[in-house]
UniProtKB/Swiss-Prot annotation:
The keyword Glycoprotein does not apply. Keywords: DNA-binding, Metal-binding, Nucleus, Repeat, Zinc, Zinc-finger. This is Zinc finger protein 59. GO terms for cellular component: male germ cell nucleus. Transmembrane segments: none annotated. It is found in: Nucleus. InterPro entries: KRAB, KRAB_dom_sf, Znf_C2H2_sf, Znf_C2H2_type. May have a role during differentiation processes. Its main location: nucleus. GO terms for biological process: regulation of DNA-templated transcription.
Length: 653
């Protein structure tokens, strides 16, 4: 729940009027059905976000009441004067008031236009980056220095409300997603989103774009054209939308400060959105899994995970994505184009973002600092991993059975087992479950548990995502590249694990010997070394092992199966690692060199074993007779003397 301080942060200084936009009846009539629904959703979300931060110290505006009742918002008028509520500063022409239907000839003042622009500004509003922003973007075209006039539909000039007055009929429907459009050309442009087609190519650098206006805007980067100038700072900009942001530099307009952390903002809407971070309020909860979100757009994006909807598909590998931006980022992995080159070392990158991260290696810049201990890191990823070392585990305990959980979501799901609240029933066997996620998980029992089969090798999986990961083994594609060393990986999780090796951070330490590890799984695997237990015994020779994986590897020795064959000489090997080491013999690659005598080895383990000759160290001792040996293989051969084990029998007597 939000603290009192976080509520006081904006209470008394921020009102709903600061971030709202109103429409009169004639303005409302100019919007089509889609824009009306969009406006209603935006205003309701704006109010809910404001309440989440401020709390109960603001009253519900009449506009919100009308929108919740799905009534027309222009009905919120002052009955005494017959004029709209004075929420936006506007000048009215009294002679043009129609007493019959209260339609006004409304002339927007500069202040009202600024209010409209500020609320729907691309950088100032928390809903501006969502999928609906481009639909509403046409409202900003009505801005003017002198003001613009919007009259009723009978007396409006053809050009005045051109961006607002759209035909309510939308006969052209997209077959992919069902979205409708008023013009065929608009539909054609939209369809390129699904096809991924980019017919407009830049002759300078070869970069392709979906729309001609995107190409035109991009070409200004090469020409250096900046037609929109700012007088006060004598700065020039390539796009008119960028013109208004530097004005805040000269006016000192960062008037809205957060009382929690002191961060300042140019707009109230940005402050309200930032306040949600301190408030820790997540009003949007998923009915499927119980996960909660602070923002509506994050909630909508999350729901596509459960529905399986991935409308944006890659033409090269067939992989689907929920968001277009993810597809665009993924497509760069297929192209070998790397236009961004480091001036220091000449290394090239696909995106400017990756180049900036790489340049921090040369500059030594570490902008991400830990608030607890002051340690600095080059990447946000390294800081996030480091901060986990300071976090204490906080468990939420069930009052009924005492079971503990890390997250409130998991505890809430668990409590349903005690209340017997299981609304989701299986139609095949009648079993009931507290949520749809567990029901879907149960349904795999009826489909032999693994409904997703690989067409290449026939292997089955319980989840589609696991099948997709597995299929990358057959394709051989490794789209995820490490920025530090250039190594490629099949999966993003493998890349993340690998990147930790560059940071040098090993937060998981063994309490027995002090050895540190990158991952908790590596620490758990290491702990077996300190135990004397060897629970996994070979039924053929009686040899015991600490790990089951070692027993499986050992079993291949008795089976005599050598499934890994060298393509150079035809020699077979039981283990893949043995084949990998053997291949270095053909390549004459011996990277591990002894500093004492200069002898080189294919494998690091061979070098370590060789170095014991110079040191005279014999760490492997026989427990029965006390004999010591340089390597474990010599000890194993010696132990057969005491056990009298004779593994190899002559077939011909």
């Amino acid at each position: 729940m939000a603290s009192t301080n976080s509520q006081d942060m904006v209470c008394g200084s921020v009102t709903f009027r600061d971030v709202a936009v109103d429409f009169s009846q004639e303005e409302w009539a100019c919007l089509d059905a889609t824009q009306k629904v969009l406006y209603r959703n935006i205003m309701l979300e704006t109010y809910s976000n404001l309440v989440a931060v401020v709390g109960s110290c603001i009253s519900k505006p009449d506009l919100i009441v009308l929108l919740e009742q799905e009534k027309e918002p222009w009905m919120a008028v002052n009955e005494e004067t017959g004029r709209p509520s004075p929420d936006l500063e506007a000048d009215y022409d009294a002679e043009n008031i129609s007493p019959q239907n209260r339609i006004y000839n409304r002339k927007f003042s500069k202040q009202s236009i600024k209010q409209l622009s500020r609320t729907f500004d691309p950088k100032g509003s928390w809903f501006s980056n969502g999928p609906n922003y481009s639909t509403f973007h046409g409202l900003r075209d009505c801005q003017s220095d002198a003001g613009q006039q919007i009259t009723n539909k009978e007396g409006v000039p053809p050009h005045t409300c051109q961006t607002l007055a759209h035909n309510t009929e939308k006969p052209y429907e997209c077959k992919e997603c069902g979205k409708c459009f008023g013009c065929r050309s608009t539909l054609t442009q939209h369809q390129s989103v699904h096809t991924g087609e980019k017919p407009y190519e830049c002759k300078e650098c070869g970069k392709a774009f979906r729309l001609p206006q995107q190409l035109t805007r991009h070409q200004k980067c090469h020409s250096g054209e900046k037609p929109f100038s700012h007088n006060e700072g004598r700065q020039a900009f390539q796009h008119p939308n960028l013109l208004k942001y530097p004005k805040a530099i000269h006016t000192g307009a960062k008037a809205f400060a957060c009382r929690e952390c002191g961060k300042s903002f140019n707009r109230v809407s940005s402050l309200v959105e930032h306040g949600l971070i301190h408030a820790d309020v997540k009003p949007y909860e998923c009915n499927e899994c119980g996960k909660a979100f602070k923002r509506h757009r994050s909630f909508v994006r999350h729901q596509k995970i459960h529905s399986g909807e991935r409308p944006f598909q890659c033409k090269d590998c067939g992989k689907g994505f929920i968001v277009l931006a993810h597809l665009t980022r993924h497509q760069s992995s297929h192209s070998e184009e790397k236009p961004f080159e480091c001036e220091e070392c000449g290394k090239k990158f696909r995106t400017a973002r990756h180049l900036v991260k790489h340049q921090r290696i040369h500059s030594g810049e570490k902008p991400f600092e830990c608030n607890v201990c002051g340690s600095a890191f080059r990447l946000q990823l390294y800081l996030s991993e480091h901060q986990k070392t300071h976090m204490e585990e906080k468990y939420l305990e069930c009052n009924v059975c005492g079971k503990a959980f890390r997250l409130q979501v998991y505890l809430s799901e668990h409590l349903k087992t005690h209340t017997e609240e299981n609304p989701f029933k299986c139609k095949l066997c009648g079993s009931a479950f507290p949520n749809k996620y567990q029901l879907n998980k149960h349904l795999t029992v009826h489909t032999d548990g693994k409904p997703y089969q690989c067409k290449e090798c026939g292997k089955c999986f319980r989840q589609r995502s696991k099948l997709t990961e597995h299929e990358s083994i057959h394709t051989g594609k490794k789209p995820f590249q490490c920025e530090e060393c250039g190594k490629f990986f099949r999966l993003n999780t493998l890349l993340i694990h690998h990147q930790k090796s560059h940071s040098g951070e090993r937060p998981f330490e063994c309490k027995e010997c002090g050895k540190a590890f990158l991952l908790p799984s590596q620490l758990n695997s290491h702990k077996i070394v300190h135990t004397s237990k060897r629970p996994f015994e070979c039924k053929v020779c009686g040899k015991s092992f600490k790990r089951e994986s070692n027993l499986i590897q050992h079993g291949a020795v008795h089976a005599g199966v050598k499934s890994y064959e060298c393509s150079e000489c035809g020699k077979g090997f039981i283990h893949r690692s043995s084949l990998f080491h053997h291949r270095k013999i053909h390549s004459d690659e011996k990277p591990f060199k002894c500093q004492e005598c200069g002898k080189a080895f294919v494998v690091l383990a061979y070098l370590i074993q060789h170095q014991s000759i110079h040191t005279g160290e014999k760490p492997f001792e026989c427990e029965l007779c006390g004999s010591a040996f340089r390597c474990r293989s010599q000890l194993n051969k010696h132990l057969r003397i005491h056990t009298d084990v004779k593994l190899f029998q002559c077939v011909e007597d």
